[in-house]
Amino acid sequence: MAANTGIIKGNTHEWEMVIGLEVHAQVISNSKLFSGASTGFCSEPNTQVALFDVAMPGTLPVLNARCVEQAVRTSLALSCEVHKYSVFDRKNYFYPDLASGYQITQFYFPIATDGHITLDECCSKDVRISRIHLEQDAGKSMHVGDKTYLDFNRAGVALMEIVSAPDFRSPEEAAEYIKKLRIILRAIGTCDGDMENGSLRCDANVSVRKVGDSNLGARSEIKNLNSIKHLAQAIRHEACRQVEVLESGGVVSQSTMLFDVDTCTTRSMREKEDACDYRYFPDPDLLPLELTTAFIDNIRASLPELPSEKKRRYMQDIGLSRYDADILSSDKDVSAYFESVVAKHAPDLAVPWITGELFGALNKRGSSIADSPVSAGRLVELLDLVADGTISGKMAKQVFALMFETEKSASDIVREQGLCQITSEETLAPIVDRIISESPDEVAEYRQGKTKLLGYFVGKVMKETNGQANPGLVNTLIKRRLAED
């Protein structure tokens, strides 16, 4: 069975994937959605738990206004309609790490609907966002041998559930969507997007249908995918599994699946529940959430420039390629660094240094640009020395490596290492004369038309000066000398 992008070539038919994503994004907030307990990561188990988080009798929820602001901010950044009226509901189910026996969510009246994210890499399309709602996270169960331990630190942490329409037709489209969503959330400061630590988790709803068919097939929901790579692998395997079932005469049941990262396969966890199984009803302890136009407009006015807008500006106003604009707009720290450098130097000088030398050194060390030992100001100083001819581009790379290693300034390193470029014609002319006089055969060949030998003479001069001669001046002097009789 062959699967090419979103089309699966089965034994009897070609099948199309239909995919929708539910993303759970942990809200950046100092305290939980309905209690004052901390949301800090990596704390000792059960040290960040309020009485309400473990459903102690008599405790009541108190809505965290910061979480509401963050949800509205996210909704606006994703072009959603923010609703002035929304309601918190109870979703009833039993699980050991859900102490109350229900989750507070927004089922009937979510905080926002009808947004979209534009894909422009693997395809060109708008993916619809059906709804965004606020809800509580559950605790964490840890199974050790025949025992289960419960950690309620995460219980009650605010999540934004961002639900897409079933608009994806390939794992690649789903992966691009998650990448773009994560970039947006980080840019506006509402979620750190750390999938490895569970700040961003994804459920994928997958079904297949014959190519050309408009009806949707029975779907499986793959739970808690914690990397983009695993998301794509899980979708592809589950779609192929469903095709095998259908082509063998079977029926795909609506079920909840888990993805095994060791075998790259999906397996059934349980039959998927319908909404009625959760017995949703409005939470009697919480009033409806009512937002004013002024509240929404104030948040809209505070939104930073979005990554897509920044990318467009870099391409149109600065003249960057799509590739460079994409890299430099995808992270707010990278963007700030780039804009500080490009304010002083032309993009064709600044961009290669940032995406080449700087990114290469950071990747080798495993650091982010926020932790770079070479600040934007220090890189500007280095490029100043290149621009005014104090050092050559080749020498600048040597200086940069020392800057990255020692955190010293470019000017200090140039002075300590004696790396100033030789730009004096009086100094270089005698060296050029001597090298030409010592190379009569090469001079004769050059004058007979073998002009590629110019590089031979330049190399000799650069070696003689330990690479410190100004290459442009050396070229000029050699050409002038060789043109003489």
Swiss-Prot record:
Similarity comment: family membership: Belongs to the GatB/GatE family. GatB subfamily.
Keyword terms of this UniProt record: ATP-binding, Ligase, Nucleotide-binding, Protein biosynthesis
PROSITE patterns in UniProt: GATB (PS01234)
Known partners and oligomeric status: Heterotrimer of A, B and C subunits.
Keyword Lipid biosynthesis: no
GO molecular function annotations of the record: asparaginyl-tRNA synthase (glutamine-hydrolyzing) activity; ATP binding; glutaminyl-tRNA synthase (glutamine-hydrolyzing) activity
Example GO biological process: translation
EC number: 6.3.5.-
Database matches in InterPro entries: Asn/Gln-tRNA_amidoTrfase_suB/E (IPR017959), Asn/Gln-tRNA_Trfase_suB/E_cat (IPR006075), Asn/Gln_amidotransferase (IPR018027), Asn/Gln_tRNA_amidoTrase-B-like (IPR003789), GatB (IPR004413), GatB_C_1 (IPR042114), GatB_Yqey_C_2 (IPR023168), Gln-tRNA_amidoTrfase_suB_CS (IPR017958)
Entry function: Allows the formation of correctly charged Asn-tRNA(Asn) or Gln-tRNA(Gln) through the transamidation of misacylated Asp-tRNA(Asn) or Glu-tRNA(Gln) in organisms which lack either or both of asparaginyl-tRNA or glutaminyl-tRNA synthetases. The reaction takes place in the presence of glutamine and ATP through an activated phospho-Asp-tRNA(Asn) or phospho-Glu-tRNA(Gln).
Listed name of the protein: Aspartyl/glutamyl-tRNA(Asn/Gln) amidotransferase subunit B
Substrates-to-products reaction catalysed: L-glutamyl-tRNA(Gln) + L-glutamine + ATP + H2O = L-glutaminyl-tRNA(Gln) + L-glutamate + ADP + phosphate + H(+); L-aspartyl-tRNA(Asn) + L-glutamine + ATP + H2O = L-asparaginyl-tRNA(Asn) + L-glutamate + ADP + phosphate + 2 H(+)
